[in-house]
């Protein structure tokens, strides 16, 4: 049906902007965009620009590999060695921060910034660890890179710096988990996610995942409770979010 629709309008060419408006133009133009413009008539995907992408403070390789799968030149960086094969710099991100990146996805440590650790904030203020965390966060956020996403859980940077541009959940993008994630964006659009199917898009939202309720009344995602004491597991980016970043920003 889509082939008939496209082949029946200007033989696969973009419609003439000077002709009178037709009620079906909006639908046609949306299909034209989704299917790749003039290349869609030939079954060829539109050529995309290859970006140099730095994924800062990532040892899992999840976001890095999502961008590589899209044809980009991506490299992860962390003080820890990588968990999976692929381009990775083991060391300080500041060693390579100014190496001509087009985009950076940064995951600065949240240990001293997240609201979940509020009970220890006074101690962290006194020993300087919180200020070190703030300084590290801001150096990444203010880096001389055209496109930047800084990711962190809900924490003090929302008040010390500015509110995040977007707050997302893994279940928005196909993973049945809850993990409130804040994104501060520079020259990047908010990640698109779809609650329910519509004419053009399939829903990306899924179930939120199992929750655990403690005797105190506190409620917590089961996966998060079971990963207590494993900060590395809790810090990983979910596959659905990584894929959305690569598809929409790459």
Task: Go through the PLM ranges and name each one.
Residues 30-250:
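Conserved active-site and SAM-binding loop architecture
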Residues 10, 16-21, 26-29, 39:
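Intrinsic-disorder-associated, low-complexity terminal segments enriched in Asp/Asn/His/Tyr and depleted
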Residues 13-14, 44:
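Glycine-centered signal
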């Amino acid at each position: 049906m889509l082939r008939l629709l496209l082949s029946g309008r200007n033989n696969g060419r973009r419609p003439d902007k000077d002709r009178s408006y037709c009620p079906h133009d909006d639908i046609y133009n949306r299909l034209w965009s989704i299917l790749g413009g003039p290349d869609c008539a030939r079954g060829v995907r539109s050529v995309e620009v290859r970006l140099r992408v730095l994924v800062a403070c990532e040892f899992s390789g999840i976001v890095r590999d999502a961008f590589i799968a899209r044809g980009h030149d991506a490299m992860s960086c962390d003080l820890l060695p990588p968990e999976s094969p692929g381009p990775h710099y083991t060391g300080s991100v500041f060693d390579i921060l100014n190496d001509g990146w087009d985009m950076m996805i940064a995951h600065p440590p949240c240990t001293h910034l997240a609201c979940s650790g509020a009970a220890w904030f006074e101690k962290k203020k006194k020993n300087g660890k919180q200020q070190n965390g703030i300084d590290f966060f801001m150096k990444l956020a203010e880096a001389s890179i055209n496109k930047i996403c800084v990711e962190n859980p809900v924490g003090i940077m929302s008040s010390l710096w500015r509110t995040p541009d977007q707050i997302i959940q893994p279940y928005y993008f196909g993973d049945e988990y809850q993990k409130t994630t804040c994104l501060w964006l520079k020259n990047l659009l908010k990640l698109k996610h779809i609650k329910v199917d519509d004419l053009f898009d399939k829903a990306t939202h899924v179930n939120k995942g199992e929750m655990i309720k403690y005797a105190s009344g506190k409620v917590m995602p089961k996966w998060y409770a079971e990963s207590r004491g494993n900060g590395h597991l809790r810090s990983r980016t979910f596959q659905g979010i990584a894929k959305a970043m690569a598809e929409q920003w790459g």
